[in-house]
Amino acid sequence: MIHGTKELLESAQKGGYAVGAFNTINVETTRAIIDAALEERSPVIVQMTEKTFDYAGGRAIFQYVKNVAEFYAGDVPIAIHLDHGKSFEVVERSIEIGFPSVMYDGSRKSYADNVRTMKKVVALARTRGVSVQGELGSVPYLGEISMEDVDWNEYMTDPEQAEDFVRETGVDTLAVAIGTAHGFFRERSEPDYERLSAVAKRVSLPLVLHGASDWESDRVTEVITRGISCFNVDTAVRLAFIGGLRKILDSSDETDLRKILGAARKETREAVQKKMRMFGSSGKAG
């Protein structure tokens, strides 16, 4: 059985750990993520974005991930998720394809527009038994901001507004903004831990954190204790894959693509396993 994210994250919330939601783009990254879950006996979320749909074909990549996930679903809990759906139409298409979990990202819209579209997404999802993630506050991207000059107050989740948002929309999980940014940064701002705690006090459902791919274990542990039940991981997956490719291409004249891509897959699997241990999800597959 393939899961939505709601069930996995509610279990994580009760168990005091977090589940990793790892982005895939192809055969190799999909196998790396699921192989890591099997090795670690960890629940896992395999997710895709609109850009991956454009690259690999939405239905094609979903069916591949679904086939692999179903093959191993008896061993570990696996969820498949649409990450950062930017419009109702993309979310609707993903549900039609068969995604058991979707995210509508209206974080750059006005609060009213975010709520309006989010309610439409939830209404559609409820008719199909699909889990829904919303986002309030915004997580900027590498290149979009200067870490020295950014005014984080423009991006942060407001705890009181988060309570209203969850009540008005009926989302299953909520992505929050506490001073993180997508991508790897040389200089990191300090996360607003108190803001996270304030959100968690007002919102009882599982909270998701984006933009923390390069965090070390102390920060990870801190936000889990304050309410985070899921970490999105994209940049770390890509860098591990690229690192594996560079390593074999720089050290040999190998031309067998299976060996070259296999080396990248191995490097990626090991990086994902490290994240699972950090999140505390290893051994939680039951």
Predicted segments with their positions:
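Alpha/beta enzyme core
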Residues: H3-S11, V27-T52, R59-D75, H84-R202, ...
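Generic N-terminal amphipathic, Lys/Arg-enriched alpha-helix
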Residues: T5-G20, E254-T255
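Hydrophobic "anchor" residues on beta-strands that sit immediately upstream
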Residues: V19, A79, S101, S131, ...
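Generic enzyme active-site microenvironment
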Residues: H81, Q133-E135, V208, K275
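Glycine-rich beta-to-alpha transition loops that act as phosphate-gripper elements at the mouths
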Residues: T24, I80-K86, L205-S217
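Active-site-adjacent C-terminal substructures of enzyme catalytic domains
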Residues: R188-E190, R195, L205, L257-R265
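Extended, intrinsically disordered, low-complexity segments
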Residues: R246-G286
